């Protein structure tokens, strides 16, 4: 027996364990239902959990709504400056910009250009909340204004996908001026008889909501998106009243007439395609006094 034990001991080799090099974000936890989801499966659903929770998309991820290889980017060379030489106790504005650019790979919040949906061309401007909270500064406003003017010049609709925390305080009054600048560009788009379709995604606050996003011809919100001007806590502290639990949600805004429809992300492409077809038909039939597009929208 002793010899058997000695022989069996010699047959084993101790192997040190090797830690696997697993990339970050392979599994993503849903903030709502807490389910762990494999990142490729989540990407296939455009980051919508099976429970219906809509996770945030980066600006370039939104371009999946367009026809494949149809998007041509414009104004990518525009980069924000630091006109005020803004310095906070923690960091300078210049440092904050460099870090945001390094982390996101973007020059600023907005990615803009021209693409198509089911073959119909449109100008596109998409916001990325990861870049300094989607804040509206000089480059943000310039890109939005140019997108509207480009749509007017080409005679095509404008689609904006909007998420923002408000004006960028580091640029002061220059940031606030962008609200008026973008709205003026949109008046030229309206004069060209081209529609502006705005999609509001979580979160959408401040100057973006208070200006161009709220004057679009069609305003679409994603389910559960937080939409407003000032934040919930600021309002409660100001009016000293408790607000409803669903206050400032997309569904609350729809109920009170602030948005035209709430559309799940899985249905957004088809909804946009229908809207573009309706507007194209409306444009062709204007001389014949066609049925108003608002009536046609009731069927969506």
From Swiss-Prot:
It is found in: Cytoplasm. GO terms for cellular component: acetyl-CoA carboxylase complex. Transmembrane segments: none annotated. Its main location: cytoplasm. InterPro entries: AcCoA_carboxyl_beta (IPR034733), Acetyl_CoA_COase_Trfase_b_su (IPR000438), ClpP/crotonase-like_dom_sf (IPR029045), COA_CT_N (IPR011762), Znf-ACC (IPR041010). Its EC number is 2.1.3.15. It comes from the Bacteria. Binds 1 zinc ion per subunit. Acetyl-CoA carboxylase is a heterohexamer composed of biotin carboxyl carrier protein (AccB), biotin carboxylase (AccC) and two subunits each of ACCase subunit alpha (AccA) and ACCase subunit beta (AccD). Component of the acetyl coenzyme A carboxylase (ACC) complex. Biotin carboxylase (BC) catalyzes the carboxylation of biotin on its carrier protein (BCCP) and then the CO(2) group is transferred by the transcarboxylase to acetyl-CoA to form malonyl-CoA. PANTHER family: ACETYL-COENZYME A CARBOXYLASE CARBOXYL TRANSFERASE SUBUNIT BETA, CHLOROPLASTIC. Belongs to the AccD/PCCB family. This is Acetyl-coenzyme A carboxylase carboxyl transferase subunit beta 2. The gene is accD2.
